[in-house]
Amino acid sequence: MANYFLNKRAVLFVWCAALSVYAYTEIPAAQNAPLPQEQTQTEMTAAVSQAQAPVQGILSITDCKALEEQYYRMQSFDPQLLLDSFDRIREALNTSFEDAGLLDLYFEHAKLISMLYVYEGNRQCGKYDTLIQGEAQDFLRQAEKLTGKRAGFTREQMSALFMRYANYLYTKIGVPKNTFAIASAVPVLYRKALMLNPGNIEAAVKLACWHIFPADVTTGNYNSYIESQEEYIEELSAADRFSAYLLYSIYYMKKYESAKGRAYLQKAVALFPNHVLLLRVYENYRKGIFSL
């Protein structure tokens, strides 16, 4: 367990350093980013998975989110159920690639597999992750070519798939050989998702969170966009809300609005009180450092 915490914190340190370097070099498009329309994550998930027949032995999106929450509570789980489910998804995709629901599940599984490999060094998941890296981007390109075509993918479905892929990549930002390429790709995927579906709340909030890294009291263009997305945080999944709470806490601390900063930190504590990131944020705040 001690090695787990040390390894994870080392990854997080590299991840944060890379983000800081990239964020300060990016020319923001925050002012022109579309604002989300009223559309909940539940509605978007339903749109992506419409007409999908249940496949026996495959974990649903809800099941995957439950495993992710369990992980965020620092409770381990046996990855074999996840890997077996992933095998069945890949088999199903070989016979029915034009099923947006299956691709959605593919990328949701991929994110969890990557988390277990990157953060814990699970070798079995590492073998699967190598497989995913070789085919995931091709899957996304094929789906993009089918977008808007008859019997293809809708814009809303493709928007959701861009976000699934971005979430998968996000788990790898702390890996040194991938850092810059992934840090460059993730915000582009957020914007692509918003272009296809301005109502994609997850994309809007995560793009706002991305802008928090370089934001401070002087960055009015970032700040207006960040604060315009704040009301949508509660629409996210539990794991995504936790990350947003921490980042918005940092944002308000950097703006010297400490009451709001502490309030968001307490929300994060209430959600996942044992998460390792909380220790890092507390330590940084004590030193007057407002970052992860």
At which residue positions do the language-model features occur?
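N-terminal leader/linker segments that initiate helical-solenoid repeat arrays
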Residues: 23-115, 119-123
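Amphipathic alpha-helical repeat scaffolds of TPR domains
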Residues: 56-72, 98-123, 154-174, 199-215, ...
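N-terminal secretory signal peptides that target proteins for export/translocation
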Residues: 1-6
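Terminal, low-structured helical/coil segments at or just beyond the last alpha-helical repeat
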Residues: 242-250, 254-292
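Short coil turns that delineate tetratricopeptide repeat
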Residues: 97, 198, 237-239, 273
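Bacterial N-terminal signal peptides
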Residues: 13-20
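Helix-turn-helix repeat elements of alpha-solenoid scaffolds
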Residues: 74-90, 125-145, 179-187, 218-228
